[in-house]
């Protein structure tokens, strides 16, 4: 069936089904719509609908289906357009509403006008004409506001005429609305603005960005200019009204309560000019002591101000980076990505990702310093800056005081309490926009006045340890400059702050997981955007002569790399010298990692001097050296994929890169070469650990012990290579005590992933030496192999010549005696040389075997574990592992033969208690108290013949049986698919026979493999066995009797341990 509008039909169906059906009408409407959509004839659809809907509608089914098909055919389900009539009705109702609202507003204004003379009794020259003008203005504003509300409601009532935000509203034909719109005055618009601002201040959480407000104000100012240009007489009238109302508002403000100044009266319709700011600034307001310095939002929040109030507030003073978060995405921080940390911390203008680790490190060496604040006099603001908004408005009333810290001893890292806390430093000037930062401060927005008043001294009961702290001689000089009050590290001093010193962020220390996307940092420093950062170094406490925990540091400015743009800690690029000609390849598939393939690809870029496959023992690595740097650069900058494989990585090869990566600015994790400089472990501390009372001097060793234990726990897991003794030197990690204070502004952001890479490079600087040694070994082996090949060739040639000479002698029997003697002499020398060469070759091969056999158990185990790890990683990555699995099986067999795959890795047979396993007269005792077992040669078979496994399971067979004991030998026949595994002892072979039959869900066929002995040896063995059996039985009987005596003695002993 043809349906024009599915949504309309669905709406009609749900409306029709609601009275006749108990089910959900909307769901049933969807179901009916699905039935009607089917590609069938009308008759079939009718029958189908009746059949399917009978369950839901029962008696109403036939009527509903007829009605449905009739509606679809006649299209009566489509909505009928009757917008013109509804519009007319709505317009009439709006006009009626407008009259009622106008009456109410006029009554309210008259009541306010009666009250106005009482408040204006201090004005110098009240006049009746002024009241008349203001009444006329109010009436005009009321009519204008009502016309606006009519337009808005009319626009929302017509869905067909929805328009964009920037589009003009639809024009009404009503003369009344048009006249009201034309007569709208600037004063009434300003009152609307103030009303909107007041609503904005009440709903603080839903604050929009400064740009939105600024654009909105600009849009309104454009409309003002349009309306202003329409009439010269209106402009003159407006100027007269403005001058009158300005004097009236000044008088009115003087009589207001002090906290109502930021809420202007509705009748105030004037703009405060820039010249009026200093007069208002003379008012004094009490400053509540709050817990942190806060940033001011914008001057547009305050009642008496708007964009025109601030003549010095220009576009170029606004820091667009702080609020234009969508206009340009931040670039990634190079230091954070490459080195693993950024010493600028949350003051870095670049992106540190979604979850950086932020650590407060005021006293850490290598932190990027910031210049000390310039000397500032307490007085008016700098000439370039507009007056701070703190001179205009007092703090909002709705703020609550900060939480008081609990009573208890102060941390010793804080200075002694000698007076009341310093007043809050003033905040950012009005020209700088800083939105509220929920990630960095937990205190609500505060505006403070510019005049410093010492706040009242807090009650001494809150800080009982204040007197005790001030009692002894202070360790720190009085020049220490205290920070603003911080509830997490409270401190009180009498030193006051300079008036116009601004803090960019007031952050709690050691915040972990700060999102740098939430930090809106002002990056470009333009004309009057002055950012003064306090140097944390100047506020550090200087230790006394008696305390020698921290060494005296060299000042930042004396260091050679201070403020040096060529500092290697902040290089933009890793510098590769122009003479570098080596390229390193990684992730090459093993089948492509051969000399011919690599030479074929890289020879097109230039002359290859050296080519190494399986570089540094990595089967997927290679090293290629070109003749010149240009050729290497051409190869690395080529867009063509290496061997047509995009997964192959190519790098510049750097000699000794692991030592070069460590820079002076790095927090050194482990030092192998310079043990004098202590390393710093990155520790996560809780708030209690940071703020809790630290014991005095006598507890320093215990603190150092705790730090040592934490360091050992925090060091990354020891890799397999190091566990197996691969590292020749032990890593000694010294720790340094770090005193963390909350007064610093610098924070270091750590990137754990990059730091791991750095730790690897620092932990293994010996790898280069090992690589050189391996190179030398490989070269020596190559030479040996070449010599051996040449000797083999010489040997073969001499054997051939010997054969030729012998055949010549046999054929030419009538040869002369002289020739025959010469040939015999030559044959003799040939045989001597051949035997000599054979001996030499045997010696070389035997020494090679000795070297192979001399592999230590640890090396074998390391190699096996490395291969197992590579196999696991490749299986996880989905790569081809056939070659690697073969190598792993060979290593397993070799390890099993040497007894490395011992029973300790799996289930073994353990004897305990008083059980006896007896066979052929031999007894193994397993008494719980460790009685010695008599060792006897066991001639029973230790080899198992295994069959019944598939070809795919052949590789896993050896590891399966290696769990039961040490394997001496393993022979797997590929053709008949049976294996013979020989265990070291009979007991292990029996355990494998009992428990090893189940393999991968199938039963293996196991049998003892008995070797066929010689007849002579069997007779001798039988005789020996008889003697052994007789001798052993007597020994066993004696030992058994002895054990019985011991048991009797045990029975007589006291059983106190059993209770």
Swiss-Prot record:
May be involved in the turnover of nuclear polyadenylated (pA+) RNA. GO terms for cellular component: nucleus. Residues 581-655, 942-1011 form the RRM domain. Residues 1019-1031, 1040-1052 have a biased composition (Acidic residues). The lineage of its organism: Eukaryota, Metazoa, Chordata, Craniata, Vertebrata. Residues 375-428 have a biased composition (Pro residues). Residues 214-231 have a biased composition (Basic residues). Residues 771-873 form a coiled coil. It comes from Xenopus laevis. Pfam families: Nup35_RRM_2, PWI, RRM_1. Keywords: Coiled coil, Metal-binding, Repeat, RNA-binding, Zinc, Zinc-finger. This is RNA-binding protein 26. Residues 172-182 have a biased composition (Polar residues). Residues 98-275, 375-443, 1010-1059 are annotated as: Disordered. Residues 434-443 have a biased composition (Low complexity). Signal peptide: none annotated. A zinc finger (C3H1-type) spans 327-355. Residues 98-114, 130-147, 184-213, 232-266 have a biased composition (Basic and acidic residues). GO terms for molecular function: RNA binding; zinc ion binding.
